[in-house]
């Protein structure tokens, strides 16, 4: 078969990723739980990045005022410099949060399966007491490791859009996180950033990986359009 015939034989997919709309009662259950939170947290995962629903996810974060923690594959979805980013306070927010909304993030080994000391549990198998909202396209992910109190199954874009609709319907009645919670996160972020700054400022010989990170940080600051490539081989 020549190239022209091969190209002509290809079948065009009309709708490669049809929307999967979440059940309205599941969305309402998630919103009801989120409203009760005293120390809410949003965790953004790889699925959130793949969904290409950046604008809606940002709107959800900013409308609710809930701090967010990006997983490594969700970096860049929202900036780490955003005032609601808890990226520099990960070890503080995970065990302290009382309601955690997972958006395209799964409770696998990267999140210690939702339990253990990472989440404030007494030992590596103990549940920390958090309540989870999980937005995911796969129903099999709900309750795979710990209880998911409010699973919302559907594509990320449709689920986040539905959540936004429910929040907007409440208008000014949506409760924002307390100043104490946000202030505690900011204090921990500032402390960790200052501590890392001291480490990066050292210039040992031979150089270590912190030295390289310091140089790269300076390059990015002066060249914000620079593209960094991380080669992931072990």
In which residue ranges do the predicted regions lie?
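Anionic-ligand anchoring segments at beta-strand to alpha-helix junctions in alpha/beta enzyme folds, i.e.
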Residues: 22-23, 29, 33-100, 215, ...
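Glycine-rich, acidic loop regions that bind phosphate or pyrophosphate groups
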Residues: 1, 70-185
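Proline-centered turn/helix-capping motifs that create local helix->coil transitions or kinks
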Residues: 1-6, 175, 225-228
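Short acidic (Asp/Glu) and glycine-rich catalytic loops that position anionic groups and cofactors
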Residues: 10, 139-143, 191-195
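Active-site diphosphate/adenylate-binding microenvironment
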Residues: 186-234
């Amino acid at each position: 078969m020549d190239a022209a015939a091969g190209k002509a034989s290809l079948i065009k997919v009309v709708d490669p990723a049809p929307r999967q709309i979440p059940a309205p009662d599941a969305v309402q259950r998630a919103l009801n739980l989120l409203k009760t939170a005293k120390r809410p947290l949003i965790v953004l995962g790889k699925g959130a990045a793949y969904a290409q629903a950046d604008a809606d996810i940002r709107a959800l974060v900013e409308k609710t005022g809930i701090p967010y923690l990006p997983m490594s594959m969700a970096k860049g979805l929202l900036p780490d410099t955003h005032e609601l980013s808890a990226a520099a306070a990960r070890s503080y927010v995970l065990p302290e949060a009382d309601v955690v909304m997972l958006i395209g993030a799964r409770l696998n080994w990267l999140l210690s399966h939702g339990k253990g000391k990472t989440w404030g549990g007494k030992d590596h198998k103990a549940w920390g007491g958090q309540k989870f909202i999980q937005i995911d396209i796969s129903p099999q992910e709900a309750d795979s490791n710990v209880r998911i109190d409010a699973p919302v199954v559907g594509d990320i874009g449709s689920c986040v859009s539905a959540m936004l609709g429910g929040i907007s319907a409440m208008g000014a009645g949506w409760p924002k996180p307390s100043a104490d919670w946000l202030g505690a996160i900011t204090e921990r972020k500032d402390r960790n950033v200052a501590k890392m700054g001291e480490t990066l400022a050292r210039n040992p010989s031979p150089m270590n990986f912190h030295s390289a990170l310091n140089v790269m940080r300076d390059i990015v600051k002066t060249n914000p359009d620079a593209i960094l490539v991380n080669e992931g081989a072990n």
